């Protein structure tokens, strides 16, 4: 018959109220935890000069050495320490295909025989030439006070031109559809920037380098904001996403054909394309813009801030200096828009919500660049572009 448990009475070390038996001695939790920490101290460390210190007095413990000595004298035993009782430390790593094969998820299905060492080059020089021609044209003459208002009017005009056109639903995303939407997106961004007076004053090479780097981030925000705007006006179903000029697609009901750009299947490359997290983020961004319902002026500033900061961080040097100057000038004009036109004395909360959207897209751009690097290392894609910097975030 086991010995009875005596769980009441004072702690045998310090005299405080006990909490049970610890390491063979009736003690409080404090003394038990102390002994667990100090049982491995060296003999030299546990020697006290006085040797007769009072363990607990005036609400505090006075001498660690005498306290440890008392623990040993009353019978605390370090051999009674219990280990491997922590569920976290004792559980094994959940088995998965990644653990079993010893390969990270993003290269789980990487098959060397499907790698594409020799690639087909897609020449997009004609797009660069078209962009140069657009930048050489005279901008729209609008009697507006600043460039942010000019860009806002340009955006409204670009979207207004499509009001009477029927929106086409893309059910299959293959080579033709991808190249077409990329071409439309790039030229759309160039057209918008061509009406940005301060941007037109930059050196020709700087302008083209910025456009080639930032157009993807620009068009992504443009399409998300256009989708949100159409939902607010009840002209687009909630399951649809704008992807091109007058074209959209169901976010959960479309076919993807990758045979033109890789030897791998869509299932094998799920990591590189629209993952469930990506879709969730896009839906949330659209809903945030529906709730905020930003004006064309606010959208124009967001487009500038997102695209120019992305280009500046990627290219550095003179381009970073130029983009920072452009963004700062437009920030001042946005302040005037809030303070003078809308008569808002406190707009920081709204601006924070708008910038949260651009920060989310910035993070998405960085992730896409890292994925592209992984794809290049393993030769996942069998195509390349004559101007690769234009497509590192597609």
UniProtKB/Swiss-Prot annotation:
Residues 8-83 bind DNA. Keywords: DNA-binding, Metal-binding, Nucleus, Receptor, Transcription, Transcription regulation, Zinc, Zinc-finger. Residues 126-394 form the NR LBD domain. A zinc finger (NR C4-type) spans 11-31, 47-66. One of its GO terms (molecular function) is zinc ion binding. Pfam families: Hormone_recep (PF00104), zf-C4 (PF00105). GO terms for cellular component: nucleus. It is found in: Nucleus. InterPro entries: C.elegans_Orphan_NR, HNF4-like_DBD, NHR-like_dom_sf, Nucl_hrmn_rcpt_lig-bd, Znf_hrmn_rcpt, Znf_NHR/GATA. PANTHER family: NUCLEAR HORMONE RECEPTOR FAMILY, NUCLEAR HORMONE RECEPTOR FAMILY-RELATED. Orphan nuclear receptor. Belongs to the nuclear hormone receptor family. This is Nuclear hormone receptor family member nhr-103. The lineage of its organism: Eukaryota, Metazoa, Ecdysozoa, Nematoda, Chromadorea.
């Amino acid at each position: 018959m086991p010995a009875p448990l005596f769980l009441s009475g004072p702690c045998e070390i310090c005299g405080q109220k006990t909490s049970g038996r610890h390491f063979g001695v009736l003690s409080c939790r404090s003394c038990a935890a102390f002994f667990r920490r100090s049982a491995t101290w060296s003999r030299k460390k546990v020697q006290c000069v006085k040797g007769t210190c009072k363990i607990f007095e005036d609400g505090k413990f006075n001498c660690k050495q005498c306290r440890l000595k008392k623990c040993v004298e009353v019978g605390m035993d370090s051999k009674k320490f219990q280990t491997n009782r922590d569920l976290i430390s004792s559980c094994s790593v959940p088995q998965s295909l990644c653990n079993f094969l010893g390969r990270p998820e993003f290269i789980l299905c990487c098959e060397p025989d499907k790698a594409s060492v020799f690639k087909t080059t897609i020449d997009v020089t004609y797009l660069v030439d078209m962009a140069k021609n657009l930048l050489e044209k005279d901008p729209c003459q609008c009697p507006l006070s600043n460039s942010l208002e000019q860009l806002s009017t340009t955006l409204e005009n670009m979207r207004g031109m499509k009001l009477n056109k029927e929106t086409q639903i893309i059910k299959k995303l293959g080579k033709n559809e991808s190249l077409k939407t990329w071409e439309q997106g790039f030229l759309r961004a160039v057209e918008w920037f061509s009406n940005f007076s301060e941007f037109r004053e930059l050196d020709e090479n700087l302008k083209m380098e910025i456009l080639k780097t930032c157009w993807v981030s620009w068009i992504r925000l443009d399409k998300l904001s256009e989708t949100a705007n159409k939902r607010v006006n009840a002209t687009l179903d909630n399951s649809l996403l704008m992807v091109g000029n007058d074209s959209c697609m169901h976010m959960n009901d479309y076919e993807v054909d990758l045979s033109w750009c890789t030897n791998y299947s869509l299932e094998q490359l799920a990591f590189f394309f629209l993952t469930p997290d990506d879709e969730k983020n896009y839906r949330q961004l659209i809903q945030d813009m529906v709730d905020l319902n930003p004006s064309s002026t606010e959208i124009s500033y967001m487009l500038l801030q997102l695209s120019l900061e992305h280009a500046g961080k990627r290219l550095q040097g003179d381009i970073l200096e130029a983009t920072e100057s452009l963004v700062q000038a437009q920030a001042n004009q946005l302040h005037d828009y809030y303070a003078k036109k809308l008569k808002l004395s406190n707009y920081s909360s709204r601006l924070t919500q708008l910038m949260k959207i651009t920060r989310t897209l910035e993070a998405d751009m960085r992730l896409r660049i890292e994925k592209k690097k992984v794809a290049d290392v393993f030769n996942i894609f069998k195509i390349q572009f004559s101007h690769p910097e234009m497509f590192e975030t597609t």
